[in-house]
Amino acid sequence: RDDGSSDSTWDLLIAYKERYPMVFDALEGENVGFAMSFTRLLQRAVERYNDADYFAFCDQDDVWMPDKLKAAVDRLKGEDHSIPLVYCSNTTLVDVNLRVIREAWDPRRVALTKERALIQSFATGCTMVFNRVAAETYVTHLPEVIKVHDFLMYQLCMFLGKVVWDEKSYILYRQHGNNQIGKKDFMGRMRKRMEGHYKEHVLELQNRRFLAAYKDLLSEEAVWLISRFV
C-alpha cells in the first residue's frame, strides 16, 4: 500500500502489479501511518482472497528464508482453527550488509501470558502468520485507534485464541536508520515502543480500546484481567 507518498512509489507498485498480477496487488491512499496501512491491506486481503487459509504481515526491508512461510504453516496445521491463531518467531538481527548481529530474543525470557501481553509483545509483525479466523476477527472488531497493528493481533490471539512462538529464526531483520520505528537495533526499537510510544498512560489507553473492541468476545476472566490494566 502506498501511504500517500509524493515520489514515484506508486508508479513502482503499479509496475510490479502489472508484471506479477497473480501474486502482487497494490492499494493507493492517503497518509494514515503504518498501523492503519497494514490494517487496510488486511481488510482488502480478507475480502478479495476469500479462499485463503493464512495471511502474513511483511516489511519491505527484511530478508525471508526460503522456508519461512512453510515453517509457520507446518506449526499451525495441527492447531484448532476454530479460534484465532498467530505464529511468530525469533528474528536474526543483521546490519545493512546482512552481517549477523545476534538473535533478537532469548527464548528463556519469552513469556507468553495474558498478563504480559497487556504490556509487551514478543511477536514481531514481519514474522507473523495467522489463520483466517484471526484475520476476520481483526478486521471486524477494530478499535477506534490502532497504534501498532502487530501488537493488536498479538493481544487478539493471546486472549481469544493462541500464540505459537518459534524460537528459531526464519528472517533477517535488517537494522538501519530508515527502519520505520527508527532505532538502530531491535531492542532499542522495542524499548522505544515501551518507554516512549507506549508509556504507562498510553498502554492503559491501548488496553482500554482493546477491551472496548473485543468485550463481546472475551471471557469474564479476561475482561476482569484487562480491566486491571486500564
Regions found by a protein language model. Name each.
Residues 139-140, 145-146, 152, 172-230:
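C-terminal subregions of glycosyltransferases and related glycan-biosynthesis enzymes
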Residues 1-186:
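Nucleotide-sugar donor-binding/catalytic module of glycosyltransferases
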